[in-house]
């Protein structure tokens, strides 16, 4: 059996990725989030498949079909609650995974990192089109506001928006295509994940010390397979607890009202995991400027490897940049809070300051801190 595992063309690939993979002996729980994201994706595809069996992508029946799933389909309420809250857990894991990458310098594996950023963008697009499907008030107005941002593109903006809408407003054609996209994208994400892993296994994992770990490697199975399983149990426990005890905690009450193009909700806002980017978008009083800031708030991750100035890889022994990292975490929490607040004083100015700090840390302060730490090393 051991021989077959290493010789069979298909099993050999799985073996090299999940059984005999040499892994650094000192990787911490922060390295669990990659496998947790795989679990999230599998959960979302599975629950989404069962929801798609009962959902209808027509504006006259979409809202009712979601009600029908929750009331009449066997365990439909559970499947829907796990799917809706699974998205939140997906993004919690993504943000933790990215934070780990930033803290320990994993971004220096450039190909893996860049595909990761593409994966983040794909996941954000998937979550956005998925939020439109229940056809509640926030679904409709969220779709209207966010797709309208494309009208800021010079010259072709107006045509672009109408092309995405499939008409002159968010209507039946929009809902139908968004459902098609929402069904397709998770499989694109799965394919990109395979690439992400392919590039990662070219170099092997980074580790908390940020140094070469070839001298001290252990096999993935049983050590990290069981460690991952423990993470799976912890996350599934959290997800099912949320889905069973407080399924609407992270949702918007406006989405319990069927979509009405004639009534605008008092505060249009996306799901909590997009609020930081939404706050950056709103902090700039110019439409095109806001859209560019929104885009760059994610794409700034692509320039992190280029702006790495330190001689050390991670932040384990770099107190200056550690301080900047935790400032960035606090700044993102502030942006998340501001994104959910109305556009009025003092929230406007707080959002603008937080947005400036966000970009300054990435583009100016972190490279400077790395340079300063190099100098400090020379003095000692």
UniProtKB/Swiss-Prot annotation:
The keyword ATP-binding does not apply. SUPFAM superfamilies: a domain/subunit of cytochrome bc1 complex (Ubiquinol-cytochrome c reductase) (SSF81648), Transmembrane di-heme cytochromes (SSF81342). Binds 2 heme b groups non-covalently. One of its GO terms (molecular function) is ubiquinol-cytochrome-c reductase activity. Its main location: mitochondrion. The chain crosses the membrane at residues 33-53, 77-98, 113-133, 178-198, 226-246, 288-308, 320-340, 347-367. Component of the ubiquinol-cytochrome c reductase complex (complex III or cytochrome b-c1 complex) that is part of the mitochondrial respiratory chain. The b-c1 complex mediates electron transfer from ubiquinol to cytochrome c. Contributes to the generation of a proton gradient across the mitochondrial membrane that is then used for ATP synthesis. Belongs to the cytochrome b family. PANTHER family: CYTOCHROME B. This is Cytochrome b.
